[in-house]
Amino acid sequence: MKHILTILTALFVVLSASAKTPNNDLIFANINDANSPFYYPNLMLRYKEGKPMSEDEYHHLYYGYAFQPSYKPLEVNPSMNRVQEIMARISIDKPSVHDIDELIAAGIAAMEHDPFSPTLLNILVYAYGASGDKVRELAYSDHLNGILRCIEQSGDGLKEKSPMHIIMFSHGTDFIASKSIGYRKGQIMSRTVEFVPFDYPRNKVKGYYFDYSRVYWNKPDNYTFKRERTWQFNNLKPQEYK
């Protein structure tokens, strides 16, 4: 197994292009048009099959998920708890076949609730690599990079007025962790934006701003949300491909 099990280092090249702020109206129109290349059922099918996807396709897939009936960001994901339990006991360097099979099954089940979780994608890259399935390992690595790139291109994250857009709270901290940066507890800046400070400044940047507004689109009136900030990337570094 060629995985180097250290703190995750991002595999994607940071692009300097201007921010691609999600246009909700346009995305909604495109993903509901059966004649559009961004028709959502087709995009999701290709994603689940591990097909290569363009940046625009990832953009519509990720932000379009907020319009799907299955998007329930405030519900508990019990399968994620199972993933955590397996990762806590597994021998990372020499996992058993049984543990890897269980991890893959739990990871796929957890993705039914959160199909674009960088943490889950990263774990599945590791699991498929450990199982010897190089095709799926590469497919999930591509998906991981595509989702991280999609988030990064949605805003520079340096100001409250130019946040990166996320559809799950954990995706923001996962994004920071993917850069091998530690972070502290997030600070709510407004009804739509949160600031997540780094453990210490990097190049004068103290942290990133994230727009989490989609999370509360369908929030029940009596709902009180409690977030956990401890789950990251399990110190896994996916395989690099050249």
What are the language-model segments listed below?
Residues 118-119, 146-160:
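Boundary/linker segments of alpha-helical solenoid repeat arrays
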Residues 99, 106-107, 140-143:
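Alpha-helical solenoid repeat scaffolds, predominantly canonical TPR units
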Residues 20-100, 161-242:
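N-terminal alpha-helical interaction modules that lie
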Residues 1-23:
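Bacterial Sec-dependent N-terminal signal peptides
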Residues 48-49, 108-114, 143-150:
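Solenoid-like repeat scaffolds
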Residues 129-152:
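TPR/TPR-like (Sel1-like) alpha-helical repeat modules
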Residues 79-82, 121-124, 128:
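TPR repeat positional signature
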